[in-house]
Amino acid sequence: MSPDDAKSAADGTSVPENGTAPKLSRKPSQKLPRGPPPLFDHLPDATADACDTFQVINDCLYGSKNMGSSDHDALDCDCAEEWHDGQNHACGEDSDCINRATKIECVSGDCNCGEGCENQRFQRKQYANVSVIKTEKKGFGLRTDADLQANDFVFEYVGEVINEPTFRNRTVKYDKEGIKHFYFMSLTKSEFVDATKKGNLGRFCNHSCNPNCYVDKWVVGDKLRMGIFATRAIRAGEELVFNYNVDRYGADPQPCYCGESNCVGFIGGKTQTERATKLPLATIEALGIDDGDSWDTAVAKKPRKKKAHEDDEDYVNSVQPRALDEDGVNKVMATLMQCKEKWIAVKLLSRLQATEDEHLRHRVVRMHGYQILKTTLNTFKDDTNVVLQILDILYQLPRITKNKISDSKVEGAVEPLASAAHEEVALAAKRLLDEWSKLETAYRIPRKKHDHAGPIPGNSFEEERRNKDREEPAKPTDPFANIVIPTGPRSTIPQRNANFFAGQQRPRKPPTNLPAGWFVNTDKTGRYYFYDATGRTQWQRPLTPAIETPKVSAKAQQDQKALQSIIDSLTKEPTPRHSAGHTPQRSTTPATEPKKDKWRSLPLEKQMKIYENTHVVDRFHGKLPKEELKKFAREVNKKLVSSDYKNNRVEDPTSIPPKQAKKVRKYAHDFFDRAVAKYTEHEKKKAHNPSKPTSGVPPGDVASSAATPAKDDVTMSDVEADTSPGSSAGRKRKRDGDDEHDDPAESPGAPPSETPSVKRIKEDDAEGEGEPTTIPPPPTPPPPPADTPPTEEDRSMREQEEALMRENEEAQRLEDEAQAEEGGKGSHEWNGRYHRTCAAGERAVEWRVGNGWCYGDDGHGRAAATTAAAAATAAAGSAGSLKTTLACFAFAPC
């Protein structure tokens, strides 16, 4: 289908016989009924064949290290970490993340949201599941193999980032090579992404007059990157398409094969321009147009006659923008941050300037307002009107403290304007600086340095920051409002010195919510590393739980602890008491953790005696619950040790005389017999009266009532043990040479019944009941990761990038030389949107003057280029005019 046929079918007009271009219609667009989008899931996967036509690269290659720069400082969001199932769900699609709203990706380590948030799609290359298909008329196309939701990330547009001179050279070069399809995308005003020969699958996304995708630019680190996103919900099997938007640059119409009901039959040219001005959807929404359809209708109702200079700016001026709301603030700030066209920036600033809602002004400040306005001020500092707009907006913004102003460094951009030659600019700048000078910098509580080897609490300070804009509920009356409450002791840290922490770098937040069994610590340089209980270390954040050693069954573990408690109590020397007149001395033996199995090194005779006493407890396993048995065993230990020390029976704490061992066995038997009887009686009463509370002692106190010994030398309470006159230090004999068996954790004032071994038993029991995670001591950091040698692919990419840099430098050098030679002669130059017409003969030529170029066409769709001198000669010797033609689908003005 030829362009003429398409036009004839579109508006019912015939093509003139003389071959002149048809007069394109300016009828208002109408919403046509649209059926379900066609599916292409029946077409075979042609990805392998498509990848043979170009070189696949994973990331952009830059013509210089400064190309693709975002011109923005690192901006962090105020979201808090949201860990679920080992994944950080902060900064999601439905969150109120200010970075996501302003099209900035969070960078791990620099943001409050923690590592691995959901606003890192470019960095993680979270592309959609797509495949390449072979279409009937459009060549290769891109198909989604899974359902997509609105705003889902499809693919990053990757290629070679080149400057404008290289871009112009390549358009001519590709045409000479017979390349039919160019893949240029405008990254900035003078930078382009060329995916013609090097790119990824995103280059196969075709054009459509009814697109289901859109192209957007995001700030990722210090670079500006371009991605393709879903406009609406897309079914698996649909072709992914977006609007190429070439008409803004004066391209001649090309046949369009999208097949949509609203297809105008051409890509570019007057047809699309007069039906609707195709600004990016995000820019349209930021300008205050309701949606694409209303925008389409509004601009189509313009008068039929349009002067040659009328363009997007004139159309926008004819449309009344809607009132600014909270969502509109997000879109305005996001578009303003990347805006390089003055007339769009003026419109966006006018919307901010006109708002009087204090809540919306607070929203502007929160959405990185000071940083974005500073960047816009630096971009358009030569335009007095734009500067006055920005200074007025800055003056209107609410200000309580100077913190955000200082953090954004906007003062550095305003201060030079105070001495500007323009009187209004100087007065506005001085007024603003004077207001800022009256503000105080609020003291900020520094972030707490967490114990990285222990559990990491939540970030309550950042949570407070995130919720500061929310309305607080009414607080109840404070009963102590009129009472002066004394404050605590002063800290040695200066509390009101605003500059105390000014020179310190903000500490990075330690990783939180690690998989089970993993812990975090820092090395000497402050770098985090991870370790588990086995001593394994690594630099990378673990994604799976640590491999745990097989655990002993609960029953066996409890039995072992009950037996060990008795063994430890009988083999340890209790803490010696000091008399009132004796000053406790510091132990000269360094504190070391006592060994739990030290009884194994004792003589066999002693081990047998310990086992005899242990066997008594073992006999009652089937008669008492495990927890009660453990508690009774502790009661036996406490009473026996207290009684022996009170009556001076201890001659050697590491051995028990046979006579005393017999008494211990008898007492233990009697104790447990009474305990079993009491427990059985209690259970019977409980069974007969299930709803009536028993008047006796609870099950946990059976030991207290059962422990009524027959002899006075055994009835020993804790109070009596503490007040006994016989508990002097002289009676607590210690054998020389047994220091290795002493418990260094014993305190001089601890009673025998509360020896550290008993305390440790209680801790062990609590550990068995609650199973808290014990934190092992951190091992030494792992060795630094070795610098792996670059792979062959890495070396190849580096060589290609260096070659691209040389190509850009050479093109820029030739451009500068041509400008110096020509000195700006001539009248034909690029005006920012369209090329001026240039005179030509039968064969039009490309004529460059200064920074402007005119693209000629020889009548057969081939671009022609020559030197400036030859172009001038051809132009001077012939007459006529010719519009430019561009073979690629997206350009930016010079």
Swiss-Prot record:
What sequence ranges are listed for the domain Post-SET?
252-268
Spans annotated as Disordered: 1-44, 447-494, 572-604, 678-830
Q: Which UniProt keywords apply?
A: Chromosome, Methyltransferase, Nucleus, Repressor, S-adenosyl-L-methionine, Transcription, Transcription regulation, Transferase
Is tRNA processing one of the keywords UniProt gives this record? no
- Any GO BP annotation: regulation of DNA-templated transcription
Task: Show where the AWS domain sits.
Answer: 72-126
- Compositional bias (Pro residues) at which positions? 774-788
One GO MF term, please? histone H3K36 trimethyltransferase activity
Q: What EC identifiers does the entry list?
A: 2.1.1.359
Localization per Swiss-Prot or TrEMBL: Nucleus; Chromosome
Enzyme class of the recorded protein, top EC level: transferase
Q: Where is the composition biased (Basic and acidic residues)?
A: 462-475, 792-830
Cross-referenced Pfam families, in alphabetical order?
Answer: AWS (PF17907), Med26 (PF08711), SET (PF00856), SRI (PF08236), WW (PF00397)
Which reactions fall under this protein's catalytic activity? L-lysyl(36)-[histone H3] + 3 S-adenosyl-L-methionine = N(6),N(6),N(6)-trimethyl-L-lysyl(36)-[histone H3] + 3 S-adenosyl-L-homocysteine + 3 H(+)
Provide GO CC annotations from the record. chromosome; nucleus
Q: Membrane-crossing residues?
A: none
Q: Tell me the InterPro entries matching this sequence.
A: AWS_dom (IPR006560), Post-SET_dom (IPR003616), Set2_fungi (IPR025788), SET2_Histone-Lys_MeTrsfase (IPR050777), SET_dom (IPR001214), SET_dom_sf (IPR046341), SETD2/Set2_SET (IPR044437), SRI (IPR013257)
Outline the extent of the WW domain: 512-544
Q: Where is the SET domain?
A: 128-245
PANTHER family named in the record: SET DOMAIN PROTEINS
The UniProt function text for this chain reads: Histone methyltransferase that trimethylates histone H3 'Lys-36' forming H3K36me3. Involved in transcription elongation as well as in transcription repression.
Return the similarity comment: Belongs to the class V-like SAM-binding methyltransferase superfamily. Histone-lysine methyltransferase family. SET2 subfamily.
**What does the entry's domain section say?**
The AWS and SET domains are necessary for transcription repression.
Q: What is this protein called?
A: Histone-lysine N-methyltransferase, H3 lysine-36 specific
Species of the source:
Chaetomium globosum (strain ATCC 6205 / CBS 148.51 / DSM 1962 / NBRC 6347 / NRRL 1970) (Soil fungus)
Gene name in the database record: SET2
